[in-house]
Amino acid sequence: MGEEFQVGATAVGIRAKDGVVLAAEKRVSYGFYTLSTAGKKVFIVNDKLAIASAGIIADMQALAKILKLNARSYELEVKKKPTVKAMAKLLSVVMFSRRFMPFYAEVLVGGVDEEGPHLIVMDPLGSLIEDNYAALGTGAKLAVSLLDASYRPDMTVEEAKKLAVQAVKAAIERDPVSGGGIDLVVVDGGGAREEEVKVQVVI
């Protein structure tokens, strides 16, 4: 994706040995103008699945709603929760179907199923890549350098939470369109839960 189409904000995902952590900062910007410092960019789909996104807020919300509705519909019909890969594939089809007028959002799909924890990275056209960690948005280069240096496959969820916060905070400190605190979602054997981390950046 060219720099002129680079989606704003910063989102990070980490696959731990016992779950997945997704985190995103809360600033909503229009160019270099801050519209809000309370934008929600992480969404719980069900107690086994969540997404984080970087891009246009309206498109993030639309994709989250599509995923929630389809996950619930599948669960009611089949009497079990869909797998993480199945929901990522569904989202991929939705995004690719709009390739001529795409959603301006990159997405991290994270969750836990019978196969264990999964983290799947998606671009605005729906390409799928499963990975151990990823960073999206304008602060991605800043965040991923810290992830590269500190990630371990045997990390616990608690360790992954700390690393995710550090990575997003690193982006907030240097990226002018990232900021406003951090929303964080953990998905593990105990379900999906959301936390808010307040960040004070001293410049």
Swiss-Prot record:
The active site is at residue 10. Its EC number is 3.4.25.1. One of its GO terms (molecular function) is threonine-type endopeptidase activity. Residues 1-9 form a propeptide. It holds the Pfam family Proteasome. This is Proteasome subunit beta 2. One of its GO terms (cellular component) is proteasome core complex, beta-subunit complex. Belongs to the peptidase T1B family. InterPro entries: Ntn_hydrolases_N, Pept_T1A_Psome_bsu_arc, Pept_T1A_subB, Proteasome_bsu_CS, Proteasome_sua/b, Proteasome_suB-type. It catalyses: Cleavage of peptide bonds with very broad specificity. Gene3D superfamilies: Glutamine Phosphoribosylpyrophosphate, subunit 1, domain 1 (3.60.20.10). It is found in: Cytoplasm. The keyword DNA-binding does not apply.
